[in-house]
């Protein structure tokens, strides 16, 4: 009996030590209070499950070696791609451009040609045309690359250019491509394409890499032509039910996107020895000197001011979050926002409420049925706060809304890979183009207004009458959302 008591006491002491040490680690990471308390509760109330969850998903990328510490200095932007004279920037928007520059070093560039691509077919056609025109290099970076008909089309294009002696590089996110068979990438590597996976996740190194993903969608051709936006490379993006936007750019902004690619590539080369290109350095992207090939699609804007932002979890302050808050708090007439996933950080949530209550027409469009159970209900949990503040909320009904756009006052807009959620604002590597151009902003506004025709506007009176079960699902989903 005495031995049994000692054994029980020893187990309790060990349990207390483990709990105390785990809580201490979480506290020392200095997260937002809500996240800290959420993890503490999980670790205390669910000791085994909580430890496993924290081990896989909760560790801070800025601690230890989540990304090789020697590569962190690479994530400093290069201002040489910014060539816009101050007098060309709207005086009212200069504080925004300065804010973004101070957050990440990204400057405004002039002389950019822009084409808005409003569906997957238009994007794939423009991308195929661009890759086929390559003479020096093709840098392709994506979150999802499926081994389906679209993936095979892209593979054939890349292999054909590699056979011509063009420097072809593919950087894909390992988690985003979990469902893509390895033989697909081996085929590309055998054909001369330099292939690399961003933060590969394989046991036993799963622990610190699941939660910080490279969500960028970039393609750069010869430093003169580039693409950025929300579309990955898979058949479902060609479906009429999939609604998304992408941007084709020519000019200095294309070279800036090339610099982002080379930064990520060097990071992978230094930390990922599984890559087929681990020992092959990539040349630094230079501002373009030659004119890009013409686009068969109509070019919407020919001389736009563009500022490329590339927030990452290594940033001291998120350029995307800072820019979004500034846009909301400085809007005069309206801010329209589209995002497939809506779980805003406290600064963004507060800015949306403040803008709406100040008389600005703030509108939020999200899919009626996001592609995830918890994503759906956690997003819904913010609708009541939006409606109470005067934000107009729209649920996109036909298919899935995947666009990530912001437009304000017909004077600026943003298009890219970043969602308005915790992951994009804090955890992921993203890329967006902030466009200081009235014609392009007006075009994005018209897209939003056209999409409104396919939406159900949520009215506060009806929303307040939703079933109790829905409210419980929303509240519980929101409780766990800060964990990740």
How would you name each of these model-derived features?
Residues 393-397:
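Active-site donor-binding acidic/aromatic loop of nucleotide-activated sugar
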Residues 338:
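Short alpha-helical functional segments enriched in proximate histidine and acidic residues
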Residues 331, 341-363, 367-368, 372:
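Helical hairpin unit composed of two closely spaced alpha helices linked by a short loop
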Residues 404:
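Catalytic-core elements of nucleic-acid end-processing and repair enzymes
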Residues 1-322, 326, 330, 354, ...:
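N-terminal localization/anchoring segments of enzymes in phospholipid and broader phosphate metabolism
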Residues 346-349, 376-378, 408, 426:
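Histidine/acidic-residue-rich catalytic or RNA/ligand-binding cores of hydrolases
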